């Protein structure tokens, strides 16, 4: 019996060891879980803080844009002294040359006198040049007071102001009432025409403001120095575009001193290749060798 009693506690000893190791494992895992929860809470709080800060920055930028648009709208607002129902309404305009900035909001150090002085520095101008405050010393000169007046049409061409932009081509008015754009043409001493009316040909002329008006005919040449319509003969031949050129083929030119007239022909770039016309090539210079003593 004594041996059985001594064997029972020996069998209970190894069963207590796993219980203690499990408790130790639980005691170690609990702080780890709590630490993970704390880190998760900190991460979520940081994300919320970033979101609120981003929203605040966006709201501040929107407010600054609204404030700038409001100040711009305020610069062009008209201030009226009398109600709009009054018959003689006096309207004052704001000068838009400089932006209107609100006076800085400070503490009680800014007195009412300083605010009044700041308000007097802002000068309101009307379109006629007079100041809003009525100061006679700062009045705009007389030549600046009048607003730009539209030029009325007059009978004489000398009094009429040219309202065409400076870079636009000059328009020539025909007897029928149509305006034809005039281009700058290259003049030649051998191409002067008589100042008679032409019936079957359209001659483009140029007129200068300094020299008297002359009639000059424009002939398209194959050289690149001539200023044409932007399409020279070489490019037309390579691109397969039929060019409209001036030639002297017809006879009988009424109203002119020339024996032959000018008429429009169409240049066919495939004529040379189809008819096997030989091209005139200049002879190459002879090659000579020279000996130099060094």
Curated annotation (Swiss-Prot):
Subcellular location: Cell membrane
Primary location group: membrane
Disruption phenotype: Maternal mutant embryos lack the body axis: embryos develop normally during cleavage and blastula stages but lack the embryonic shield at the shield stage. The dorsal organizer is absent and embryos fail to form the head and other dorsoanterior tissues.
UniProt motif SLRRSST motif: location: 184-190
Keyword Transmembrane helix belongs to the record: yes
Record flagged with keyword Secreted: no
Top-rank taxon, per record: Eukaryota
Complex formation: Interacts with axin1; leading to promote the tankyrase-mediated degradation of axin. Interacts with axin2; leading to promote the tankyrase-mediated degradation of axin.
Protein name: Protein huluwa
Organism in which the protein naturally occurs: Danio rerio (Zebrafish)
Lineage: Eukaryota, Metazoa, Chordata, Craniata, Vertebrata
């Amino acid at each position: 019996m004594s041996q059985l009693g001594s064997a029972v506690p020996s069998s209970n000893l190894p069963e207590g060891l796993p219980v203690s190791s499990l408790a130790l494992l639980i005691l170690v895992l609990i702080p780890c879980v709590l630490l993970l929860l704390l880190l998760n809470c900190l991460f979520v709080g940081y994300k919320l803080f970033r979101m609120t800060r981003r929203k605040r920055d966006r709201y501040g930028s929107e407010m600054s844009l609204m404030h700038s648009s409001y100040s711009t709208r305020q610069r062009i607002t008209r201030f009226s002294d009398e109600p709009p129902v009054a018959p003689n309404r006096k309207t004052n305009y704001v000068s838009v040359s400089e932006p209107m900035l609100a006076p800085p909001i400070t503490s009680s150090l800014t007195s009412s006198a300083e605010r009044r002085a700041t308000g007097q520095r802002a000068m309101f101008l009307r379109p006629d040049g007079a100041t809003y405050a009525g100061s006679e010393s700062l009045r705009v000169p007389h030549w600046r007071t009048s607003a730009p007046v539209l030029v009325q049409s007059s009978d004489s061409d000398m009094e009429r102001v040219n309202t065409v932009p400076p870079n636009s081509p000059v328009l020539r008015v025909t007897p029928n009432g149509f305006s034809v754009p005039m281009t700058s043409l290259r003049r030649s001493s051998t191409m002067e025409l008589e100042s008679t009316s032409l019936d079957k040909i359209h001659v483009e002329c140029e007129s200068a403001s300094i020299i008297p008006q002359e009639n000059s005919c424009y002939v398209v040449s194959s050289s690149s120095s001539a200023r044409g319509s932007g399409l020279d003969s070489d490019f037309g031949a390579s691109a397969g575009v039929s060019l409209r050129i001036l030639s002297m083929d017809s006879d009988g030119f009424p109203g002119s001193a020339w024996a032959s007239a000018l008429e429009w022909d169409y240049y066919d770039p495939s004529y040379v290749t189809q008819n096997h016309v030989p091209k005139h090539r200049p002879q190459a210079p002879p090659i000579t060798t020279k000996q130099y003593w060094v």
